[in-house]
């Protein structure tokens, strides 16, 4: 099926082994819906992943709201996955460094708070800021921190981004709900670069998604997860793209759209090589090879969940409406 451009396929997960297709009627009905009801194939959810630059104050957030509004106006089912806003992850890492070195981190913390609350008219982040302050105070006291503590601190970047986007969408009449992936994506306890437990995670993501009202837009936090004790873990640097690919796979999405500040994938870094050309289309194997060789727009683990479900990945520029 993967080798044929006009063929798609889906998996049936079951405890019934090879006879699953005879017993899992509901899953089979979903897979066959696109054949007997062609309009059902069109209605597949699109997963939209927004990077940090897209969620920055000013034009970035405005463009994201426009994109989401246009999708809803077209009655396209969507699910959103967000990274930390702008350079929030770097700021949080710096706060940890300052606190652990016994330096005064409060001015940097105040700057972080001001930057994150700029687009908001209500104090919806007060609890998050209080929790962050308490953790930093503890780090300053012992002048050290573990990878577990670092994951806790970094998680505020994605949590704040998701809460901010939910608030702004709601202000525009677009009902949205935060889905905190720490309650959904389960991992081992390898803090800083945790491995996902696919079966547990898929079950939790599907359950949360299917419980939403039809018109509600789910906003998933990228990058963060939790072990089975409920302790916060992260999926590695740039792991938000991996989160988006996992969620697209779990939801059997029609497409994963990665919105960023560049037009797509180029033959070389256009910032370093002015003659670099945009690549119109790549096979999964080519994209995976690029990821393994360090293409920054891709995460090396991102491609595999998409290959397994034959889900296209489209790289789009948030700031160019005609970008394809």
Feature map (PLM): residue ranges:
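Catalytic active-site module of serine/aspartate enzymes centered on a nucleophile-bearing elbow/loop
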Residues: 3-40
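A short helix->loop->beta-strand "cap" motif at the edges of active sites that frequently abuts
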Residues: 4-6, 76, 311
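General small-molecule cofactor/ligand-binding pocket signal
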Residues: 8-10, 177-179, 314-316
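Nucleotide/pyrophosphate-binding catalytic subdomain
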Residues: 41-303
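Internal nucleotide-binding/catalytic subdomain
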Residues: 255-257, 315, 320
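Long, charged amphipathic helices and adjacent flexible linkers at domain junctions
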Residues: 277, 319-324
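Acidic/polar loop patches that form or flank catalytic/metal-binding clefts of enzymes
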Residues: 299, 310-317
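Acidic-aromatic/histidine active-site loop/patch
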Residues: 306
